């Protein structure tokens, strides 16, 4: 099977990537899916819960209501909202640190904590100011907004130890590595989850990974190489780069697993104006019915693009019915 964007986020979390850990916990908190973390994988959420209750005491955290699922038991919804807010703020800080480490990601537009005007309770996004629905951020230092507070640092190190120490999670991730990959040629067909990064004109897009650029098949293979290094190498610079690559695959516009210009998580929590929620899709999706481009992709991955039996079998195809998509 082929890794998807959520698979890669879990792989990153199991590898010890703080940004991926925070992403996995935030999504679980948003949907009230605590059982998977606590009962399924033995992840200890108590340090995060204690921190959240202390830090956001008196804050109703209305922007952080639990979307809910069949398994969600709202025993203490106030605590759940606080936990949800605490990990979300931590996530934005960790993502900011990661973006600063990797200017080649070209994700500066996602650095929003330093664009907050705490007095006016607004945030500037793409040059436009928006009022914030929530501006209670006791752990954000205006002079160093992406730095974790001491309490947040302790929480994340405990979560990291819990993810790394979960035998069941590590066993499941080992299975993803043993049986999964970025792409798979099979019976003359090409399988992958998301997209092949393309330019607006349909040509293969060059994407920087480390000190070099890659496109098409070479890009998929180089990214997979770094993912495996990020999990299997001993602690060090290369392992950390591999883990950062996992987060890149989760959220970057040039990721073959994501394929959108940006991930507007911050806006959806704090800004009422839905116009800033838009996540433009990769140029790839314009060419799904273009025989020339599809043939070029199949050929690039070593298949016969002219064969009538050759197909691209593609996952990650969200359809917005309310917007008229089919």
Briefly describe each language-model feature range:
Residues 1-326:
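Feature recognizes metal-dependent phosphohydrolase scaffolds
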């Amino acid at each position: 099977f082929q890794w998807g964007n959520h698979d890669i986020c879990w792989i990153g979390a199991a590898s010890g990537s703080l940004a991926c850990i925070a992403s996995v916990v935030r999504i679980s908190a948003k949907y009230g899916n605590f059982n998977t973390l606590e009962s399924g994988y033995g992840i200890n959420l108590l340090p995060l819960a204690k921190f959240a209750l202390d830090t956001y005491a008196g804050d109703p955290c209305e922007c952080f209501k639990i979307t809910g699922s069949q398994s969600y038991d709202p025993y203490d919804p106030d605590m759940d909202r606080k936990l949800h807010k605490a990990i979300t703020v931590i996530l934005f800080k960790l993502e900011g640190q990661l973006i600063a480490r990797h200017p080649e990601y070209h994700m500066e537009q996602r650095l929003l904590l330093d664009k907050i005007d705490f007095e006016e309770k607004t945030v500037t996004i793409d040059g436009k100011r928006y009022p914030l629905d929530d501006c209670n951020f006791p752990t954000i230092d205006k002079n160093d907004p992406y730095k974790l507070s001491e309490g947040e640092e302790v929480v994340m190190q405990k979560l990291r130890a819990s993810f790394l120490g979960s035998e069941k999670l590590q066993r499941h991730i080992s299975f993803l590595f043993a049986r999964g990959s970025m792409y798979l040629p099979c019976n003359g067909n090409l399988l992958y989850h998301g997209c092949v990064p393309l330019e607006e004109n349909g040509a293969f897009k060059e994407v920087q990974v480390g000190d070099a650029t890659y496109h098409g098949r070479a890009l998929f293979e180089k990214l997979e190489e770094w993912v495996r290094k990020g999990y299997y190498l001993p602690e060090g610079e290369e392992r950390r780069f591999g883990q950062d690559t996992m987060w890149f695959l989760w959220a970057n516009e040039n990721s073959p697993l994501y394929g959108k210009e940006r991930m507007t998580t911050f806006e959806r929590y704090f800004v009422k104006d839905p116009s800033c929620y838009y996540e433009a899709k990769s140029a790839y999706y314009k060419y799904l019915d273009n025989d020339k481009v599809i043939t070029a992709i199949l050929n690039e991955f070593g298949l016969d693009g002219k064969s009538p039996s050759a197909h691209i079998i593609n996952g990650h195809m969200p359809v917005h019915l309310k917007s008229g998509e089919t």
